[in-house]
Amino acid sequence: MGPRGRQSPSATLAPSQGSCFFILFCLRLGASCPQACQCPDHAGAVAVHCSSRGLQEIPRDIPADTVLLKLDANRISRVPNGAFQHLPQLRELDLSHNAIEAIGPAAFSGLAGGLRLLDLSHNRIRRIPKDALGKLSAKIRLSHNPLHCECALQEALWELKLDPDSVDEIACHTSAQEQFVGKPLIQVLDSGASFCSTHRKTTDVAMLVTMFGWFTMVIAYVVYYVRHNQEDARRHLEYLKSLPSAPVSKEPLSPVP
């Protein structure tokens, strides 16, 4: 038997190892949630709530295993490229009630297959970034944005999976065709109207104007060329008239033998 009171090495190390594990666990918890956000437990899924925090940009320290991310009611004005590419498990993304005006073409890269809901309602989006949203399979909310109704918007909508519960609230804030301003976009398109036909007409008019300009230039050149030649011919004729003429002999011509 060993001496009384002497503890085994394992007994000595056990509390120390437990303390280390506890510290690492606490550090893991602290690092798993951005400072300005809350991360409640949702049935084992990681949810990050950053609503109404006065954020002006998207936090960079969001946990990689986040499933639900709420960034609504902040002051975010732009979504840069690759903002969420480190969140492959993200299923719901709420960016509503911000001041978003610009969305990078690769803003949602890495989310094409997994994202189920993207809320961009109540922002300042005027034009739909087709490159950023076209590859997503998620339902997208775009209501209450100052959209400019044009051909590019109409073409982009064909590639988006709009949320059916809010699609009727997407309206034309501005448009080249003033009769559609303030009207629901879906109602306008269902009536048979097309913003692309106006675009094509504008393009045709521009082409006709260009062709007319070239035709006018050609005619002007031809007129200038003809007048220039006429002037040269007139000067040449005057020059010939100014030459002294040879005297005409008045003697009768002798008959030819």
Swiss-Prot record:
Q: How does it sit in the membrane?
A: Single-pass membrane protein
Main location per the UniProt record:
membrane
Which InterPro entries does UniProt cross-reference here? Leu-rich_rpt (IPR001611), Leu-rich_rpt_typical-subtyp (IPR003591), LRR_dom_sf (IPR032675), LRR_TM_domain-containing (IPR050541), LRRNT (IPR000372)
List UniProt keywords, sorted A-Z: Leucine-rich repeat, Membrane, Repeat, Signal, Transmembrane, Transmembrane helix
Tell me one Pfam family matched here: LRR_8
Q: Where are the transmembrane segments?
A: 205-225
**Subcellular compartments:** Membrane
| Record's keyword annotation contains Coiled coil | no
Q: According to the record, where are the LRR repeats?
A: 65-86, 89-110, 114-135
- KW 4Fe-4S (keyword) present: no
Q: Can you give the residue ranges of the LRRCT domain?
A: 145-198
Query: Could you name the Gene Ontology cellular component terms for this entry?
Result: membrane
Q: Where is the LRRNT domain?
A: 33-64
Q: Which SUPFAM superfamilies match?
A: L domain-like
Source organism, top-level taxon: Eukaryota
Endpoints of the signal sequence: 1-32
Q: Which family does it belong to?
A: Belongs to the LRRC3 family.
State the name under which the record lists this protein: Leucine-rich repeat-containing protein 3
List the source organism. Mus musculus (Mouse)
